[in-house]
Amino acid sequence: MPDYVISVVTNALNDLGKAVKGSRILILGLAYKANVDDCRESPSFVLMEKLLAKGAEVDYNDPFVPVIPKTREYADMAGKKSVEIDDSFDLILLSTDHEKYKSFDFSDYPCPVVDTRNCIKHKPQSYYKA
């Protein structure tokens, strides 16, 4: 599943004439499931790792996980802080379907949004399901 999501992200960026390498990507949701702060075994970590390995600059936003806790598997990510959602990113990747994201208005966002949960109500022009 993570490899498929990465391929959709790659295609979305390619549609803009951009490569993954050097692109700024925002992952929405670090928690394992919606509206909780438990990020153990979250697929978002795998997505972050794969995107970083491809040379992307990756940040995340999660209202329930303001700072990445120390874990054995992802110790190098510990302490990274959640950032605000804004239009400075090349791509937004929704990984966890928090209520905040379902109702967030992405319709005016200039960058593509890849939705792995098929939950965004106010979609941008450049919208991809993964």
Tell where the protein language model's regions lie, with residue ranges.
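Structural/interface elements that position substrates and couple domains in central-metabolism enzymes
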Residues: 1-130
